[in-house]
Curated annotation (Swiss-Prot):
Protein's organism: Mus musculus (Mouse)
Domain of life of the organism encoding this protein: Eukaryota
SMART domains: RRM (SM00360)
PTM annotation (N6-acetyllysine): residues: K758
Modified-residue entries (Phosphoserine), positions: S703
Name of the gene this protein is made from: Rbm12b1
Biased composition (Basic residues): 259-277
Protein name (Swiss-Prot/TrEMBL): RNA-binding protein 12B-A
Record field: compositional bias (Basic and acidic residues): 244-255, 550-572
Region ranges (Disordered): 237-277, 539-572, 620-644
Length: 836
C-alpha cells in the first residue's frame, strides 16, 4: 500500500534526484516525488510500502543540500489539494496577455489529472518526478508573454522528460514530424536531468511539435516551448551550414536535410567561439589512476557514448615511462558532460578519476613531466646499458622485464618457480635462484620475462600463497637485476652451459657471474674444496634433477690421510660394517676402513681407483663434470650371486671370528644408486645410545636355517614399533613397503639400534578442526614427509579431534621437524609435535 510523506524545508536548488538520494535504500515508485516549493520548501513523496514510509519518517532532521528537512505523515487527499491550490494560485495571478489560453490550460490539466487517476495506483496528479520545475518554485525560468502558434525557428526545448528516456523515445513522441537531432541535457555526474533540445527539419515541423505541449510520454506530461539556435550550439549542437535557418522551408526537402544535418553534426566541430562554452575550463578532462596496461582503445570503450578518436587522447610520460595520467579532448559539451559523469568508473580493476582541466593547465602538466630529453636521462642513469649490449639483444633501459621474488622457501627449485608462473612460458634459463657465499638458498629469486607486458601481468601475483608462504613480487629492470650479480642468459650463454655441465645439470640452480665468488656456489672446482664442516651446512641445497645432495659427498682431500688420522674418536665404533655391531666384539675387529676397498677384485679396484686414489691430490674439473654414478660402475653380476643368508651362515659356522673376504664385498644394493643416505655420516644422535654391552643379537634375529628377511607384505610383526593407536586413523602401514617411497631407503645392514633409516611417525596435536592434508603437507614443507601418510584423527562420531599423524622417512628428519616446527601456528592455533 502506497504511503504519502510530506517534506518541509527543501532548499531552492534541490530537485527530485536529491530527494531520491536522501531516501537512498527506500523504494520510491517512478513519479513518486512531487515538489511544491514555496517559502517553506514543500514536497510530497510516495513510498511503496508502510515499512519504507516508517523508515523514511525516522530520517526527519536530516540534511538535503545543507538544509535541514522535516518529515510528516500525509495522505493522497492532502497532496492533491495542495497541488490544486498551487495551480489555482498560479492561474489566478495569470500571465500578461494570457487570455483564455490560460483557462484552456487549466481544463487541459484537469482532464489529464482525471485521466491519470483512472489508471494510476496512487492518484498522482502531476507529472511524475518532474513535478513543477526543479528549482522548487513552480515557475518557468524562461517565461514567455504569449505562447506562439507557429515556431520562430526549428528548435524546441523540452522539459519534464523521464530520466531513462533516449533519442528514439523523443522521436516517437514527435511521430509524424521530421526530427533532425536530439540533445539530452545531463547533470554534472552524467545523468539525465529531464530536459532536452530538439532540432526539426523545418519551422513547419517545429510548429507541429509545439502542439504536443503537455502531451504524455509514458506517465509524464512534457512541456514543449520554443528554443533557439544559440541553445542548440551551447548544448553541443552544430551551427546551420550557410548562415541562418530560413523561417519557412518546404516539407519535401525535410528528409534530405535531416540526413545531411545528422551526419554533419557528427563529423564537424562547433563553429561557435569558445566563449560560448558553459564550462570555463574547456572541453578537456584529466584522467588519473589509470592502469599502466590501459591503451587508447580501452579509453574509447570507456567513453563509448562520445565521438572520440585516438588523436584526442594523450598519455603522460615521465622519464620515458608511462604514468597513470592522461588527457582527453572532447569536441562538444555534450561529450564533455558525459565524460565527467563517468567519474570513478572502474577500468581494469582501478577507479579512474576524471577531473575537468583547462588547456593551459593541461599544457603545463605535460611540459612538467616531459621536459627532460632521453639523452640527458641516459647520462643520469649510472647503470645504463652500453650500445654493444643493446646490439646484442638488450631491451631499452626503461623496460622492466624482471620480477624480484622474496619470501620463498630456502630450498625452492626452478621447477617449483615455473609452476608458480604456470600461465607464462618460462624456461629454467629465465629463473635465477639467489644463494649466499656458501651456496645456501636465500629464499629469493629473479625471473626474466619476454616482454614488459608479461612482467606486469606476473606482478599481479604479488602476495599470493606459494608452497604455504605468501610471496612478495616486485617489478625491476635488467640494470637492477645485474646489481644482484646476474647476467642475462644471451650474454653468457657459453659460460652458463659450461657451469651447468661442471656440476651435473645446473647443480647450483642459479646463473651468476662465475668470477664472483659470492655469487656462484659451485661454478669452479675450487668451490668444491670446502672443509667438510662447511659442506654439512649445505644439506638443504637440493639438486634440481636427481635430488642428490652435494653437501653429503666427501671431499677428495678426505682420502689423503690414513684411516687412523681421518677417524675421529667418536668414529672408532663406526669404522667397521654395521653388521658387526652385533657379530663381533669391538676389540676383535682388525680391518681398517681402507681395507674395505681392497676386498674387491683387481678389476673392480681399477674402476674405483681413478677418482679416489690416483687423482685425489689434483682432481681435474673433468671428474666433477660427470655424475657420481659414472665413477662407481656396477661390478660384474657374479659378485651378487650369493645371497645374504649364505653370508651370515658362513660367518656363523666360523663362530663370528674368521670372516672371509667374500662377506664384506660391496653389495649390489649399495652400488645401485649413490644417494645421500649411502654417504651420510653417522651423527652423534645415531650413536649416542649404542653402548658396547648392547652388542647382542636382536630379538627378531633368526637362525641361519630360517628365513631371515621380513615378508614383503609386512603382515607379521611391525618392524617400526607399535602402531596400535593408529587404528582410528586413516594411515595404513600395511600398504607401505620398503622401496615404495622414493626418498626412503632400506639399508642392507642389521643395526637395529640406529633407527635413522626407519619410517618414523610424528603426532601433531592442537590442529584446527578444519585443517586438511594439503595444509599439513605445506606445514612440513622442506622435510621428508611421505605424501600419502597424512592421517587425520576422528572420534567415534566421525568428527575431527584436532590431531593428525604423518610418517617421516627417517629418524633425523622426524627429530628435526619436532624441534623446528613444534609451537608453530597452523591457522589460528599453535600445534605441538611429538614422536611416536
Amino acid at each position: 500500500m502506497a504511503v504519502v510523506i510530506r517534506l518541509l524545508g527543501l532548499p531552492f536548488i534541490a530537485g527530485p534526484v536529491d530527494i531520491r538520494h536522501f531516501f537512498k535504500g527506500l523504494t520510491i515508485p517512478d513519479g513518486g516525488v512531487h515538489i511544491i516549493g514555496g517559502k517553506v520548501g514543500e514536497a510530497f513523496i510516495i513510498f511503496a510500502t508502510d515499512e519504507d514510509a516508517r523508515r523514511a519518517i525516522s530520517r526527519s532532521g536530516g540534511f538535503i543540500k545543507d538544509s535541514s528537512v522535516e518529515l510528516f505523515l500525509s495522505s493522497k487527499v492532502e497532496m492533491q489539494k495542495t497541488i490544486e491550490m498551487k495551480r489555482t494560485a498560479r492561474v489566478g495571478r495569470g500571465r500578461p496577455g494570457s487570455g483564455a489560453s490560460g483557462v484552456g490550460n487549466v481544463y487541459h490539466f484537469s482532464d489529464a489529472l482525471k485521466e491519470e487517476e483512472s489508471y494510476s495506483g496512487y492518484g498522482s496528479s502531476v507529472n511524475r518526478d518532474a513535478g513543477f520545475h526543479t528549482n522548487g518554485t513552480g515557475l518557468d525560468l524562461r517565461p514567455r508573454k504569449t505562447r506562439p502558434l507557429k515556431a520562430e525557428n526549428p528548435y524546441l526545448f523540452l522539459r519534464g522528460l523521464p530520466y531513462l528516456v533516449n533519442e528514439d523515445d523523443v522521436r516517437v513522441f514527435f511521430s509524424g514530424l521530421c526530427v533532425d537531432g536530439v540533445i539530452l541535457l545531463k547533470h554534472h555526474d552524467g545523468r539525465n536531468n529531464g530536459d532536452a533540445i530538439v532540432k526539426f527539419a523545418s519551422c513547419v515541423d517545429a510548429s507541429g511539435g509545439l502542439k504536443c505541449h503537455r502531451s504524455f510520454m509514458g506517465s509524464r506530461f512534457i512541456e514543449v516551448m520554443q528554443g533557439s539556435e544559440q541553445q542548440w550550439i551551447e548544448f553541443g549542437g552544430t551551427a546551420t551550414e550557410g548562415g541562418d535557418t530560413p523561417r519557412m522551408r518546404s516539407e519535401e526537402h525535410s528528409p534530405s536535410r535531416r540526413i545531411n544535418g545528422r551526419h554533419f553534426r557528427k563529423r564537424s566541430h562547433s563553429k561557435s567561439p569558445r566563449a560560448r562554452s558553459r564550462s570555463p575550463l574547456g572541453f578537456y578532462v584529466h584522467l588519473k589512476n589509470l592502469s599502466l596496461n590501459t591503451n587508447k582503445r580501452d579509453l574509447r570503450n570507456l567513453f563509448r557514448d562520445t565521438d572520440l578518436t585516438n588523436d584526442q587522447i594523450k598519455f603522460v610520460y615521465k622519464d620515458e615511462r608511462r604514468t597513470r595520467y592522461a588527457f582527453v579532448m572532447f569536441k562538444n559539451q555534450k561529450d564533455y558532460n558525459t565524460a565527467l559523469g563517468l567519474h570513478k568508473t572502474v577500468l581494469q580493476y582501478r577507479p579512474v578519476l576524471i577531473d575537468p582541466v583547462s588547456r593551459k593547465e593541461m599544457v603545463r602538466i605535460i611540459e612538467c613531466y616531459e621536459k627532460k630529453r632521453p639523452e640527458s636521462l641516459e647520462k643520469e642513469r649510472p647503470g645504463r646499458v652500453s650500445q654493444k649490449y643493446s646490439q646484442e639483444g638488450f631491451s631499452g633501459s626503461g623496460q622492466k622485464l624482471c620480477i624480484y621474488i622474496r619470501n620463498l622457501p630456502f630450498d625452492v627449485t626452478k621447477g617449483e618457480v615455473q609452476k608458480f608462473f604456470a600461465d607464462f612460458s618460462l624456461v629454467e634459463d629465465d629463473i635465477y635462484l639467489l644463494c649466499d657465499d656458501k651456496g645456501v638458498g636465500l629464499g629469493e629469486a629473479l625471473v626474466r620475462f619476454k616482454s614488459e607486458e608479461q612482467a606486469m601481468k606476473a606482478e599481479r601475483l604479488n602476495r599470493q600463497r606459494f608452497l604455504g608462504i605468501e610471496v612478495l613480487l616486485r617489478l625491476i629492470s635488467e640494470e637492477q637485476m645485474q646489481e644482484f650479480g646476474v647476467k642475462s642468459s644471451w650474454l653468457s650463454n657459453e659460460r652458463t652451459q659450461a657451469c651447468s655441465r661442471s656440476h651435473d645439470g645446473d647443480d647450483c640452480s642459479c646463473l651468476f657471474d662465475l668470477k664472483d665468488p659470492s655469487s656462484c656456489s659451485f661454478g669452479q672446482s675450487e668451490s668444491l674444496r670446502y672443509h667438510p664442516k662447511d659442506l654439512r651446512k649445505m644439506g638443504h641445497f637440493k639438486h634440481p634433477q636427481g635430488y642428490f645432495r652435494q653437501s653429503d659427498r666427501r671431499s677428495p682431500e678426505d682420502f689423503r690421510h690414513s684411516p687412523e688420522d681421518y677417524r675421529h674418536p667418536w668414529e672408532e665404533h663406526t669404522s667397521h660394517s654395521r653388521e658387526e655391531d652385533w657379530r663381533l666384539p669391538l676389540e676383535d675387529w682388525k680391518w681398517s676402513q681402507e681395507d674395505d676397498f681392497r676386498q674387491c677384485h683387481e678389476k673392480d679396484r681399477r674402476q674405483l681407483r681413478s677418482p679416489w686414489e690416483e687423482d685425489f691430490r689434483r682432481p681435474s674439473q673433468e671428474h666433477f663434470r660427470r655424475s657420481y654414478q659414472e665413477h662407481i660402475r656396477q661390478p660384474p653380476e657374479e659378485h651378487f650371486r650369493r645371497s645374504r643368508e649364505e653370508d651370515f651362515r658362513h660367518v656363523a659356522d666360523e663362530d663370528f671370528r674368521q670372516a672371509s673376504d667374500e662377506d664384506f664385498r660391496t653389495s649390489q644394493e649399495d652400488l645401485r644408486y649413490p644417494t645421500d643416505e649411502d654417504f651420510r655420516r653417522v651423527s652423534v644422535e645415531d650413536l649416542r645410545e649404542v653402548p658396547e654391552k648392547d652388542l647382542r643379537l636382536p630379538k627378531n634375529f633368526r637362525s641361519p636355517g630360517e628365513e631371515f628377511w621380513t615378508p614383503p607384505d609386512f603382515r607379521g610383526q611391525h618392524p617400526f614399533g607399535n602402531f596400535d593407536h593408529l587404528q582410528g586413523g586413516k594411515f595404513d602401514f600395511e600398504k607401505y613397503k620398503f622401496g615404495s617411497f622414493p626418498d626412503a631407503k632400506v639399508t642392507s645392514d642389521l643395526n637395529l639400534n640406529c633407527v635413522s633409516d626407519k619410517i618414523i611417525p610424528v603426532k601433531i596435536s592442537n590442529l584446527p578442526f578444519k585443517a586438511n592434508a594439503s595444509e599439513i603437507l605445506d606445514f612440513f614443507h622442506g622435510y621428508k614427509v611421505i605424501p600419502d601418510s597424512v592421517s587425520l584423527q576422528y572420534n567415534e562420531q566421525g568428527l575431527p579431534i584436532g590431531e593428525a599423524i604423518v610418517a617421516m622417512t627417517n629418524y633425523n628428519e622426524a627429530l628435526a621437524a619436532v624441534k623446528d616446527l613444534s609451537g608453530r601456528p597452523v591457522g589460528p592455533r599453535k600445534v605441538k609435535l611429538s614422536l611416536l
